[in-house]
């Protein structure tokens, strides 16, 4: 497969595919970016006599390559056996799978792990169980192997420009997420409060999601491509008193004025009276600079400064298995957006289980998913799934088509 893109994302995906691990691979965390890989490809082509790509022309696409999916089910018969087990006794099946998670208090053995009716909508998982999803995604891996697990890379990020990259170990994630957790608390956020997150795909987005989970707040991520009207309607519907955003987002050569959109959204419906604090990650502008392209008000807080003042550890909140973890709104394409509530125990197990069974993700693997955190795929397969299983999640800002040469 000849590669024409210029990003670490593309390089990672090519490496994944050539290793027959669709979106999951065990490669060093400092894997070379695509500019280096392109040189390697060119040298290989020259040695083999195969012509190199014509660099004088733009290439809009690469040749399609289809690979069979990988699964922990090594045969169809083993899959059918597992499926039959889940159908024959769902409660026993999920009770066994719940051992994937670390519980502060084990679910009650006096009640079924799964009870209720999907038809009636009163389904509940793991009664009596107590846990924290952030602890399961970060702390337990950092503490593993006598604390050496904290040296493993938890997240790799590539910015809009391929040269803008960062890595975070599990120890660094624990410290940063704890500081954000304490920053949220300093603004009055408490267990059960809804925090609306309207951010680009920068490291602080999944970190803020995890921070909400850590303190028991309910995160409501709104896709950063939505309008002020769409954002305002979701803030109002969820009764969210807190908003976390960034000054701008980058998408290729475009700058998206996120803070300006938030300011506009707060004039919609009852948002002006509802929202108590807007926390802003400032990436490019000083709030006091004369050329700052947005307005800061008395309720706005400069998040970078606030986070820097916080202690590097926050005790995780003990959550009931049925406590709300997050709300995610439907797109609204078939009517008014509907806020779908995902609860702690059931969702955490779902994210861990499906990431394992579908992608065979193991510790040491790097997992890349091109979804945005504004959608459920991004929640599960960019943030929670890989981290719950102790892998490395790869996230990128902007679009996979940029830069396209």
Regions found by a protein language model. Give the residues of each.
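N-terminal chloroplast transit peptides
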Residues: 1-26
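A short helix-loop-beta submotif of the ANL/AMP-binding
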Residues: 181-182, 187, 194, 200-228, ...
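Structural core segment of the AMP-binding/adenylate-forming
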Residues: 210, 214-305
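N-lobe entry segment of adenylate-forming
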Residues: 42-168, 172-175, 179, 270, ...
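Adenylate-forming
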Residues: 86, 138-142, 173, 177, ...
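Conserved pre-ATP/AMP-binding loop-to-beta segment of ANL
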Residues: 151-153, 275-286, 294-329, 336, ...
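Conserved AMP-binding/adenylate-forming core of the ANL superfamily
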Residues: 134, 151-210, 227-232, 299-308, ...
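Conserved AMP-binding/adenylation subdomain of ANL enzymes
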Residues: 346-366, 376-405
């Amino acid at each position: 497969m000849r590669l024409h893109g210029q990003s670490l994302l593309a390089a990672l995906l090519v490496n994944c595919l050539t290793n027959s691990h669709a979106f999951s691979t065990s490669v060093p965390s400092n894997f070379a970016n695509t500019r280096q890989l392109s040189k390697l490809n060119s040298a290989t082509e020259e040695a083999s006599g195969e012509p190199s790509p014509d660099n004088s022309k733009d290439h809009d696409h690469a040749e399609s390559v289809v690979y069979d999916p990988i699964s922990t089910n090594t045969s169809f018969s083993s899959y059918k056996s597992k499926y039959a087990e889940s159908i024959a006794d769902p409660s026993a099946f999920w009770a066994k799978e719940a051992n994937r998670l670390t519980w502060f208090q084990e679910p009650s053995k006096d009640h079924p792990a799964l009870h209720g009716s999907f038809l009636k909508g009163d389904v509940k998982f793991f009664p009596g169980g107590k846990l924290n999803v952030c602890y399961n995604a970060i702390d337990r891996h950092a503490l593993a192997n006598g604390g050496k697990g904290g040296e493993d890379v938890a997240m790799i990020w590539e910015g809009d420009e391929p040269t803008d990259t960062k890595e975070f170990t599990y120890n660094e994630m624990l410290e940063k997420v704890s500081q954000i957790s304490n920053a949220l608390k300093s603004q009055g956020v408490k267990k059960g409060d809804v925090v609306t997150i309207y951010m680009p795909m920068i490291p602080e987005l999944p970190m803020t999601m995890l921070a909400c989970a850590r303190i028991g707040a309910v995160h409501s991520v709104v896709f950063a491509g939505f309008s002020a009207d769409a954002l305002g309607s979701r803030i109002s519907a969820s009764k969210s008193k807190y908003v976390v955003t960034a000054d701008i987002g980058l998408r290729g050569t475009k700058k998206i004025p996120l803070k300006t959109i938030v300011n506009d959204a707060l004039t919609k419906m009852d948002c002006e009276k509802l929202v108590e604090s807007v926390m802003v990650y400032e990436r490019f502008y000083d709030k006091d600079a004369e050329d700052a392209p947005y307005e800061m008000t008395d309720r706005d807080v400069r998040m970078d400064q606030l986070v820097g003042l916080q202690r590097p550890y926050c005790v995780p909140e003990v959550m009931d298995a049925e406590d709300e973890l997050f709300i995610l709104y439907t797109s609204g394409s078939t009517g008014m957006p509907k806020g779908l509530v995902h609860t702690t125990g059931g969702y955490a197990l779902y994210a861990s289980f499906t990431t394992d069974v579908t992608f065979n993700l193991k510790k040491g693997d790097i997992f890349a998913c091109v979804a945005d955190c504004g959608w459920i795929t991004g929640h599960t397969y960019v943030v929670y799934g890989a981290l719950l299983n102790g892998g490395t999640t790869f996230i990128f800002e902007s679009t996979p088509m940029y830069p396209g040469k």
